């Protein structure tokens, strides 16, 4: 429990009573749930010791709305990554497509380890978590070999 207490506020999961008398220590005090939509709960979310109230697997965040994919660009923020979504926009005058992209800030739960720039992530929409974050990482796929910069998954 001491390894999660790295900020001033006491870290604990909502709905877990830490003061119970008859606790089976084999199972431990950990709440996790399945988010549905065909996504599996990661092993680290079940057996880990991290506390993250914005995690869709161990926190009180529901995934509803859009499911998108993107490529990880930056990992410089704490528990937040920037992904790039490439798409084609049609120009009617020239009867051609042009390449465009959007960068999105996405919450990355600590249950996903070894995420690097270039990996493909699947994200799901949730309630606003901050000023710019409205999506949560649901699945991580390791990057393929050498790919072109602009690619439609």
From Swiss-Prot:
The keyword RNA-binding applies. It comes from the Eukaryota. It holds the Pfam family Ribosomal_S17_N. InterPro entries: NA-bd_OB-fold, Ribosomal_uS17, Ribosomal_uS17_arc/euk, Ribosomal_uS17_CS, Ribosomal_uS17_N. One of its GO terms (molecular function) is rRNA binding. Belongs to the universal ribosomal protein uS17 family. One of its GO terms (cellular component) is cytosolic small ribosomal subunit. The keyword Cytoplasm does not apply. The lineage of its organism: Eukaryota, Metazoa, Ecdysozoa, Arthropoda, Hexapoda. This is Small ribosomal subunit protein uS17. Keywords: Ribonucleoprotein, Ribosomal protein, RNA-binding, rRNA-binding. GO terms for biological process: translation.
